[in-house]
Amino acid sequence: MKPKFSVLLVHHRNDRFGTLNLILETLPIKVSRVRSAKEAEARLCEMPCPHLVLTDAALPDGNWMDVLDIAAKAVEPVNVIVISPVADIKLYLDVMDQGAFDFMTDSFTVPDVVHILKCALDNAARHRQARAVNRAPVPVESPHISL
């Protein structure tokens, strides 16, 4: 069966994302991988657009804020989760204030990751459905004129 959801993983450090990759491989999710903000931008400008972006806080050509800006311009609604190597309260607050769906550190548990992913994917799907409903043409009835 074709996966219902897709995730874009944006990182350049394979050593840090090994466990997350293993978790994603066990779920019915299509996973794409890019190594930079520029590559993420190209992927978010095409259809079908991923439902969720999991991005490293630091990238070779930018950071999480660049990915959030790119995601805001994506062709479809997409959520972003920022992943940091350390628990940093200031970074967490900045990430959430700038509109990310969530923030995770490398020290996550499998149940926590699965729960966060499910919430983020469901939220993106609801936003896409609402957007599609708002874009649907409203049928116009012909006026009945009595002569």
Where do the model's predicted regions map?
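Two-component/phosphorelay signaling modules centered on CheY-like receiver
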Residues: F5, R13-R35, E39
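Short amphipathic alpha-helix used as the core "switch/output" element in two-component signaling
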Residues: M65-P77
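C-terminal output helix
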Residues: K90, F108-L117, A125
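CheY-like receiver
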Residues: D122-L147
